[in-house]
UniProtKB/Swiss-Prot annotation:
Similarity annotation: Belongs to the AMN1 family.
Functional description taken from the UniProt entry: Negative regulator of the mitotic exit network (MEN), required for multiple cell cycle checkpoints. Required for daughter cell separation and chromosome stability. Involved in copper sensitivity.
Organism encoding this protein: Yarrowia lipolytica (strain CLIB 122 / E 150)
Biased amino acid composition, Low complexity: 38-74
Protein name as catalogued: Antagonist of mitotic exit network protein 1
Keyword vocabulary terms for this entry: Cell cycle, Cell division, Cytoplasm, Mitosis, Nucleus
Compositional bias annotation for Polar residues: 1-26
Domain of life of the organism encoding this protein: Eukaryota
Keyword Thylakoid part of the UniProt annotation: no
Region of interest (Disordered), ranges: 1-149, 697-717
Keyword flag Cell membrane: no
Biological process per Gene Ontology, one example term: cell division
Location relative to the cell: Cytoplasm; Nucleus
Length: 717
């Protein structure tokens, strides 16, 4: 049954067409655009004469079925027209403020929707929440403040798809991601005019955003090149037009500097792959664990944990690895800013991703040309230019988008990429190097950093543990090109000798951490290299495990860097004796970690124990580690030290007991001179019976017993 349309008075909104002209969707009523009347008078005449409009067979009408009357009246046609234009016209009337205070009429919705909504981000959210397509609104929305809105805002408030604009609404196909079926969402032409003044500022910004977002993500998905984004499923809701993006996101997110700062905080949560230093090294045996912890239960737990870690290598998980990768799929403007942050810090812990990156870089020629590797010829040229624009120029379309790489790479980390080749590093050296501050190849035995990665003079941290190709020639190259070097981790680089350390100490005065520990070829590092590091650098952390470090080199280190030393790792330095470590500890007041595993010639542990207790009294707990022999000697030395302290306390008590009694100076009692017998079971058996000392002890014991009875008689709270 066709719902009846309420009568309208002269003040109703239908009479306002004399003041405002609405270009109605006449194609839905009259068929093809050729049959559309030129004015409302022809429309009235055709309806009054009863002529039926010519309907195009290629485009079926989406109107509800006409009533049984063969000649519809003007009122009925107006009701149908109002039901069609309700979604957008009611919004225009609510914004312009030309609606009477009367209650708006209620119209029945059409029998079928006007058009299928485009699969945009908003449409997807509505469909997910409501379980269907976006419903037609039957009542006008509340009034909106028009001070901050222009025509673009009004057009998006209507029932328009993201492809529609106030000027035109073409029927555009929407291609899904690679591997999915292609679907088309058809929209009907809709156009209207408004008496509101258009804001030129909004139009200018909209045109600029359009210019940045001309290119579609379809090019990336259809490309045959092997690239990390080629297999990414890019949904259609993330590739909407400029009008849809500008209407859904906040204005602040369209400002390049603000967006860059926001994404910088996202990037700050990403953990760089690294090997965290252990709080304590694993015990060598169960007895060693018992000597360390002093408790059987803790010792068993530590030993079981050590066995488990030895059998199953740890897989370090780094959180936030894909945080910025999701930002790449928002829109093209976010893609450019996110990519800039990703290239600022390059780190890989997966061999497959590293291979893809090398393949992409070799195909495009440089990481800056990442956007051009899949462009087709009909798009505008994005060739690399000499100037480097800022983000404002990128957003406004005043410069080429591939020149975004104004911030060079500062971090380059390869974490356990054992199959990395030297040819790959040589290919990327001039594209990544030049401004590196952190360079790390962790257990990459087959590669060594080339000169291009060391150039620029900004390198501060170089970590190359397990790189067997690092030698003295490489250290001389580092010394010449990295004057600001502060951290040099060269563990298991067994070709490094004193010559390389001397060159490094002469050109890198800011060096604070040096680790040249090794298990083989320890004779290459001796007094000459350690002495040069101690004299010419600011080293506070030294790792020389397995090296031929002697007592003289330790005195050099204590003399020049004593109070600045923080960590000393001397495991396996068999040349160290009691003439070095026990004697230099008073000069190293800030020492926090001391590792002496395998230093079997050190037997004077009293000085080490006194140093440890001195640090603990000042609320500093140093970590002193050793092997099983070292720990057993430490425990024995601690017991002997406790016995010595007990003897001193007892000796002081005996001296106080035999001191002259000032209260009874007139009474002189001949005291028997005795020597305390600590081997006796009774420590007071040597005191003569009936002497002043015995009376003092009896009085003292009486006072102690009375005080204990007094405390025991007090009620407990």
């Amino acid at each position: 049954m066709q719902p009846s349309t309420p009568k309208r008075s002269k003040g109703d909104w239908s009479t306002t067409q004399q003041r405002r002209s609405y270009s109605t969707p006449s194609a839905l009523i009259f068929g093809s655009p050729e049959d559309t009347p030129a004015s409302s008078s022809s429309f009235a005449s055709s309806s009054s004469t009863g002529t039926t409009p010519n309907t195009s067979p290629q485009r079926p009408s989406q109107l509800p079925k006409s009533p049984s009357s063969p000649t519809p009246s003007r009122r009925g046609l107006r009701g149908k027209l109002a039901s069609l234009t309700l979604g957008a016209a009611e919004r225009v009337r609510s914004i312009s403020g030309r609606i009477d205070d009367r209650e708006p009429p209620v119209y029945a919705p059409p029998a079928q929707p006007l058009a299928n909504p485009q699969e945009s981000l908003m449409g997807w959210m509505v469909e997910r929440n409501n379980g269907g397509t976006r419903p037609q609104q039957r009542h006008p929305p509340p009034r909106l403040d028009t001070s901050n809105y222009g025509v673009s805002a009004i057009s998006n408030n209507g029932l328009l798809t993201p492809e529609q604009t106030p000027e035109s609404s073409p029927i555009q196909p929407i291609h899904r991601a690679k591997g999915r079926t292609t679907s088309y969402y058809q929209t009907q032409p809709f156009k209207y005019t408004s008496s509101l003044r258009e804001d030129p500022f909004i139009d200018r910004n909209r045109n600029r955003i359009k210019e940045v977002q001309e290119l579609d993500f379809e090019e990336f998905n259809n490309s045959e090149d092997d690239f990390c984004l080629s297999e990414t499923d890019v949904h259609s809701e993330f590739s909407s037009s400029a009008d849809s993006t500008s209407s859904q996101c906040h204005k602040a997110l369209r400002i390049p500097e603000i967006l860059y700062n926001i994404l910088s905080h996202v990037e700050a949560d990403v953990q760089v792959p690294h090997e965290p230093p252990p709080q304590r090294r694993r015990p060598l045996s169960l007895r060693h664990a018992f000597l360390i912890y002093g408790d059987r239960e803790k010792a068993h737990q530590a030993w079981e944990r050590a066995l488990k870690e030895e059998q199953t290598p740890t897989q370090q998980m780094f959180k936030g690895d894909g945080a910025l990768h999701g930002c790449l799929l928002v829109n093209k403007f976010w893609f450019e800013v996110s990519r800039k942050l990703l290239y600022n810090k390059l780190h890989f812990c997966d061999s497959q991703k590293w291979r893809q990156f090398v393949h992409m870089s070799s195909d495009t020629g440089s990481p800056e040309d990442l956007i051009t590797w899949s462009r087709s010829s009909h798009h505008r040229s994005l060739s690399r230019s000499t100037g480097q624009p800022n983000l404002h120029q990128l957003a406004n379309g005043e410069a080429e988008m591939n020149d975004y790489f104004d911030t060079p790479t500062k971090l380059f980390v390869l974490h356990k990429i054992s199959n990395a080749q030297q040819s790959e590093i040589d290919l990327l050296q001039h594209k990544i190097g030049g401004a590196l501050e952190w360079l790390e190849f962790y257990t990459c035995a087959a590669i060594v950093p080339p000169l291009g990665l060391l150039a620029g003079g900004s390198l501060q941290k170089i970590v190359l543990p397990g790189c067997t190709k690092v030698d003295d020639a490489f250290l001389k190259l580092v010394a010449e090109n990295c004057p600001r070097l502060q951290i040099a981790d060269l563990r298991a680089c067994e070709k490094v000798s004193n010559e390389g350390l001397v060159a490094l100490a002469g050109k890198c005065p800011q060096l604070k951490l040096l680790n040249v520990g090794r298990t083989q070829m320890g004779h290459l590092i001796s007094y000459r290299g350690i002495s040069a590091i101690a004299r010419k650098t600011q080293v506070n952390t030294l790792g020389a495990a397995g090296c031929f470090v002697c007592d003289k080199s330790m005195w050099e280190l204590a003399w020049y860097r004593g109070h600045s030393l923080d960590r000393l790792s001397l495991n396996g330095c068999t040349l160290l004796t009691n003439d070095s470590i026990p004697r230099i500890l008073p000069y190293t007041s800030n020492l926090a970690v001391l590792e002496l595993r395998g230093c079997t010639q050190i037997t004077d542990f009293k000085s080490i124990i006194k140093f440890k207790r001195y640090q603990e009294r000042h609320k500093r707990e140093p970590l002193i580690e050793g092997c099983e022999i070292f720990e057993s000697r430490m425990r024995e030395a601690e017991f002997q030290l406790e016995m010595d302290i007990s003897r001193e306390i007892l000796r002081d008590c005996v001296q106080w007991i035999y001191a002259p009694d000032h209260d009874q100076e007139s009474v002189r009692v001949k005291r028997k001179k005795v020597v305390p017998n600590f081997a006796s079971t009774s420590r007071l058996s040597f005191i003569p019976h009936g002497s002043d000392a015995a009376r003092k002890l009896a009085a003292t014991s009486t006072r102690v017993e009375s005080s204990s009875r007094h405390h025991s008689s007090r009620p407990s709270h």
